[in-house]
């Protein structure tokens, strides 16, 4: 079941250089991801061993992963004009801005088009401001219509004035192109210390969000620029570094209650074999070890992000798509039955504090269980029918409110 994008937060954002973007790019990524599964974890036993899952859970997860990669391999794609693109001649970037927009228009007509999409421009700093603005203007000039859930990602933000500048620019571009005001959303990349703590010692993120004047859809964490800015040695710059945990915690607190989506960063350990075909048996075995190690590493990082309340992250390589979906589905499936039982018990007792086995439930826990089941349905880990074992219909889950659910049942 594919839910409407209004019900969803994408589980990932896939980044790809603008110079490489073609109408068929999402489908090609899915095909490459399926090839990796077939080569390195094609059956339930090898899949379970690779990711450290028990066989029953692995069987359910693998089936869902394959179906996902065949039908909708990419949930969110970002056409990248920053790190994944680099600095090129003015004429070359002009050409890629136009060609990427035309390719996007064609891609919308193809099956499996991502329900979320957008572009990442260069930073609005003194060095790259003119280039960033020109790329965005040229891109929009080619677009007669925007796909749903289109966003512009602003990297390396250090000052609310940069968010305000992008907002002003989008106001003008929407008016020029005849788009509904406010259609284009902004994602702010939190990858500098200045985006965490302002020069006056206060939290910076609320000011950044405010400067976007209602356009800010999400905050995306950039772990490698952030750790480098914190003077952490290159060998220690990683997604699960304690410095990154602090930044993510600040992001969560700053965005709480604002309806803003949070995204974690990427793993740079890619599932790429060392030896190309034709390879000897020994080389194939070495490839298998290398790829499966990277798969497990990515899987574990995604699970860690999920456990810490980051339900979206970056993927940089098609080989990361299988483990992204596997981690998400496993995270929700393994807790479906306990969560559903606890929620059913909670609702049956009319929101009074109860005991379900040895686990104590109060109202806050019940709200968390409700949110868990809704996210599980929205990401495709399980169906509304499976979530109904909680005793709630999908409409009740979507209400997100125990008061509404209980009042409707008392009526």
Regions found by a protein language model. Name each.
Residues 1-411:
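Expand to "…catalyze enediolate/carbanion chemistry for C-C bond making/breaking, isomerization
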């Amino acid at each position: 079941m594919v839910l409407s994008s209004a019900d969803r937060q994408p589980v990932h954002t896939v980044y790809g250089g603008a110079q490489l973007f073609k109408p068929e790019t999402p489908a090609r990524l899915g095909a490459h991801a399926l090839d990796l599964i077939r080569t390195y974890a094609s059956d339930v036993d090898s899949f379970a061993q690779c990711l450290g899952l028990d066989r029953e859970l692995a069987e359910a997860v693998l089936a869902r992963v394959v179906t996902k990669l065949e039908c909708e391999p990419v949930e969110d794609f970002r056409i990248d004009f920053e790190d994944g693109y680099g600095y090129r001649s003015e004429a070359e970037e002009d050409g890629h801005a136009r060609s990427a927009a035309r390719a996007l228009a064609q891609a919308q007509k193809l099956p499996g088009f991502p329900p979320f999409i957008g572009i990442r421009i260069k930073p609005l700093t003194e060095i790259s401001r003119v280039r960033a603005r020109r790329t965005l203007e040229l891109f929009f000039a080619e677009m007669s219509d925007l796909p749903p859930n289109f966003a512009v990602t602003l990297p390396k933000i250090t000052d609310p004035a940069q968010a305000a500048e992008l907002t002003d620019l989008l106001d003008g571009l929407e008016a020029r192109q005849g788009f509904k005001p406010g259609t284009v959303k902004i994602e702010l990349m939190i990858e500098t210390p200045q985006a965490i703590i302002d020069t006056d010692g206060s939290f910076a993120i609320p000011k950044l969000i405010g400067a976007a004047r209602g356009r800010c859809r999400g905050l995306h964490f950039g772990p490698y620029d952030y750790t480098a800015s914190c003077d952490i040695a290159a060998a220690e710059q990683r997604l699960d570094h304690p410095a990154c945990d602090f930044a993510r915690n600040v992001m969560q607190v700053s965005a709480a209650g604002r309806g803003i989506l949070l995204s974690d960063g990427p793993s740079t350990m890619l599932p790429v074999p060392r030896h190309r075909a034709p390879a000897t048996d020994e080389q194939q075995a070495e490839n298998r070890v290398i790829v499966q190690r990277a798969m497990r590493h990515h899987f574990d990082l995604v699970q860690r992000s999920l456990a810490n309340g980051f339900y979206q992250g970056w993927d940089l390589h098609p080989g990361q798509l299988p483990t992204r979906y596997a981690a998400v589905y496993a995270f929700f499936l393994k807790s479906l039955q306990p969560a559903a039982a606890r929620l059913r018990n909670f609702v049956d007792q009319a929101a009074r504090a109860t005991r379900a086995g040895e686990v104590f439930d109060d109202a806050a826990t019940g709200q968390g269980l409700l949110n868990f089941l809704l996210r599980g349905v929205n990401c495709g880990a399980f169906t509304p029918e499976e979530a109904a074992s909680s005793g709630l219909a999908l409409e009740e889950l979507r209400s997100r409110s125990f008061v509404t659910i209980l009042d409707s049942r008392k009526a």
